[in-house]
Amino acid sequence: GLLDVVGNVLHSLGL
């Protein structure tokens, strides 16, 4: 879902 995408982006940014 959208939240899954957001979580993946944050993880990619190292947050």
Curated annotation (Swiss-Prot):
Top-level taxonomic group: Eukaryota
Gene Ontology biological process terms in this record: defense response
Entry GO terms, CC: extracellular region
Keyword Secreted: yes
List of residues that carry Leucine amide: L15
Subcellular location, record wording: Secreted
Keyword Secreted: yes
Function: Caeridins show neither neuropeptide activity nor antibiotic activity.
Protein name, as recorded: Caeridin-4
Keyword annotations from UniProtKB, A to Z: Amidation, Amphibian defense peptide, Secreted
Major location category of this protein: secreted
Expression sites (tissue/organ): Expressed by the skin parotoid and/or rostral glands.
